[in-house]
UniProtKB/Swiss-Prot annotation:
GO biological process, one term: translation
A Pfam family matched in the record: Ribosomal_S19
Keywords: Ribonucleoprotein, Ribosomal protein, RNA-binding, rRNA-binding
Protein name in UniProt: Small ribosomal subunit protein uS19
Native source organism of the sequence: Buchnera aphidicola subsp. Schizaphis graminum (strain Sg)
This protein's encoding gene: rpsS
GO molecular function annotation: rRNA binding; structural constituent of ribosome
Amino acid sequence: MPRSLKKGPFIDVSLLKKVEKAVKINDKKPLKTWSRRSTVFPNMVGLTISVHNGRHHIPIFITEEMVGHKLGEFSLTRTYRGHTADKKVKKR
């Protein structure tokens, strides 16, 4: 179920402060965040944000197409390595 329109999009306050500061001084260093639930805002376009995936911070360059999505959508938490082959079938 999507978020109510009367509430508006969510962004973590500390992340918003970091973004505003980086935009103000035109800083290009990646911003480190653990807030995967924050929505990408238009003023983030052009910044690099390192989003935590549970193990590492994954750097993500924000583009216009990402606006409105959550940061966690771009930092995958699970790796799929495929199913292992059956050893009995493999020997034939």
